[in-house]
Amino acid sequence: METLKRKIIDEGRLLDGHILKVDNFLNHQIDVRLMNDIGQAFAERFAGTRIDKILTIEASGIAVAAIASQYFGFVPVVFGKKTQSLNLDAEAFESEVYSYTKQTSYKVRVSKRYLRPGEQVLIIDDFLANGAAASGLIDIVRQAGAEPVGVGIVIEKGFQPGRSKIEAHGIRVESLAIIQSFDDNQVHFG
C-alpha cells in the first residue's frame, strides 16, 4: 500500500536502529483518512472470505480493526485485553504473549461470550515482528472452536520470523507494508 509506505518514510522514526515509531499516525495519534484506506485495503485483500468477527489486541489494533469492520459489513470487533480487570468476565479464553517492545510476558484474555464455535475470525493488528501477539490471538480463536481465516497486518517487519510462525499454523497473512531492513538507519521495503 503505497500511501502507507510513504507515510512511514515521511513521518516514521527509527529508535535504536530497530524500533519503528509511527505514533504520530498509527498508534498514539491516529490519521483517520489513512485508517480508512487501510480498512479498504484489508477488505480488498480478504474479499470473498466470510468474516463473522474481527479480533485484535488492545490498544493499537482497536482503531484499525474498528475502521476495517465497516468494509466487512460492520461485523463485531473483539479485542483481547492485556490486563486482568473486574469488568472482564471470569469465563475467558486466555493465551500468554511476549512483548518484544515492552520486554515482558502478559496474558491476553477474551470473554467466552464474544467468540463462538464455527465463527470465522479475521485477526487484525498494527505490527507483525516475532508473531507472538498474532499467535496468541490464533490460540484464543482455536480455544473458542472458531476458525482463524486470516491475519491482516498494517506493518510487517519481514526480516523477523512472525510471518513464518503464523503460516506454520496454516493461516494466510496479508501485510500492507513489509519492511525488509532498517539498514543504514533507514526503512527499506520489500
UniProtKB/Swiss-Prot annotation:
E.C. code: 2.4.2.22
Matches recorded under InterPro entries: PRibTrfase_dom (IPR000836), PRTase-like (IPR029057), Pur/Pyrimidine_PRTase (IPR050118), Xanthine_PRibTrfase (IPR010079)
Transmembrane segments: none
GO biological process: purine ribonucleoside salvage; xanthine metabolic process; XMP salvage
Transferase among keywords: yes
HAMAP family registered for this protein in UniProt: XPRTase (MF_01184)
Main location, first listed in the record: cytoplasm
One Pfam family recorded for the sequence: Pribosyltran
PANTHER family registered for this protein in UniProt: HYPOXANTHINE/GUANINE PHOSPHORIBOSYLTRANSFERASE (PTHR43864), XANTHINE PHOSPHORIBOSYLTRANSFERASE (PTHR43864:SF1)
Catalytic reaction(s) noted: XMP + diphosphate = xanthine + 5-phospho-alpha-D-ribose 1-diphosphate
Entry similarity comment: Belongs to the purine/pyrimidine phosphoribosyltransferase family. Xpt subfamily.
Protein name in UniProt: Xanthine phosphoribosyltransferase
Physiological role: Converts the preformed base xanthine, a product of nucleic acid breakdown, to xanthosine 5'-monophosphate (XMP), so it can be reused for RNA or DNA synthesis.
Binding site for 5-phospho-alpha-D-ribose 1-diphosphate: A129, N130, G131, A132, A133
Subcellular location field: Cytoplasm
Source organism of the structure: Laribacter hongkongensis (strain HLHK9)
Keywords, sorted A to Z: Cytoplasm, Glycosyltransferase, Purine salvage, Transferase
